Amino acid sequence: MLDAMVKKALFLLISLLAATHQPMKAENKVKNPETEWSDENERSLPSVPQLSIDEQNLYIRSSVELTNLDVCIRDSRGNIVYSDSHYIPAGGMTVIPVASFNEGEYTLFINEGSKYVIATISIN
């Protein structure tokens, strides 16, 4: 009889834990940035855009005005999942929604003229 009660209690405990368990979610990350943002003939751009990401959005910040910033995101198969041009005022940012992206690795290409940033972003 004690065995049956222990089994019942254990079953209830496991059921309760399974019902309330929230899956752990790792933070999305920007990894492996590669930049070529300084050209010998274009010294007027003093800083590379800063990238950050959370579970909903990718943020691109810049301390200088970027007037025609092309942003392209490709999935692991090379398919374009996002492509658009952006304007970022000095000290401003642009926001790109990533909440609808499937889990996985994506390659981010950002360029303005001959200057570029390539980074890997991880969506978890």
Regions found by a protein language model. Give the residues of each.
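Bacterial Sec-dependent N-terminal signal peptides
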Residues: 1-28
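Transition segment at domain starts
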Residues: 22-53
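C-terminal tail/sorting-segment detector
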Residues: 38-40, 109-124
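Short edge beta-strand/loop segments characteristic of extracellular beta-sandwich folds
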Residues: 56-63
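Short proline/glycine-enriched turn/loop motifs at strand-loop junctions of beta-rich domains
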Residues: 64-68
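Beta-strand signatures of extracellular beta-sandwich domains
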Residues: 70-74
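Short, glycine-anchored, charge-dense loop/turn motifs used at functional sites
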Residues: 75-80, 106
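Short, surface-exposed loop/turn motifs with a glycine/proline- and acidic-biased composition
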Residues: 87-111
